């Protein structure tokens, strides 16, 4: 038997991926180094918005996503990286959210 509880991120991804469908609108409210954003993107949501107030965090997230083959998702707008506080979410997203992580 595989132990899925190796770390909190792995455990959270295991649970969250059950709720993300190809029609889901998903938010990573604090993208940081991009690892959670990457996991969410790999679940295949319709849209993924990743917020951070630090430009370096957004740049690091972009670099990670590109290195993992998600350039097209970024270019198409399926994944949107936003350098702003998640408290300003209403300025960027008008549709209901299906999943949000902090």
Model-predicted segments: where are they?
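S-adenosyl-L-methionine
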Residues: 1-25, 29, 35-42, 59-99
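Glycine-rich phosphate-binding loop of nucleotide-binding enzymes
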Residues: 17, 40-42, 53-70
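A general structural motif
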Residues: 23, 45, 96-97
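Residues at the starts of beta-strands that form the adenosine-phosphate
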Residues: 25, 46-47, 78
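Conserved proline-anchored active-site loop of SAM-dependent methyltransferases
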Residues: 29-31, 97-102
């Amino acid at each position: 038997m595989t132990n899925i509880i190796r770390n909190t991120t792995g455990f959270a991804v295991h649970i969250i991926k059950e709720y993300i469908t190809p029609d889901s609108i998903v938010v990573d409210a604090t993208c940081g180094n991009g690892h959670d954003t990457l996991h969410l993107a790999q679940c295949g949501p319709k849209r993924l918005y990743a917020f951070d107030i630090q430009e370096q965090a957004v740049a690091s997230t972009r670099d990670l996503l590109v290195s993992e083959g998600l350039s097209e998702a970024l270019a198409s707008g399926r994944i949107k990286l936003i350098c702003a506080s998640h408290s300003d979410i209403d300025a960027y997203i008008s549709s209901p959210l299906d999943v949000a992580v902090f």
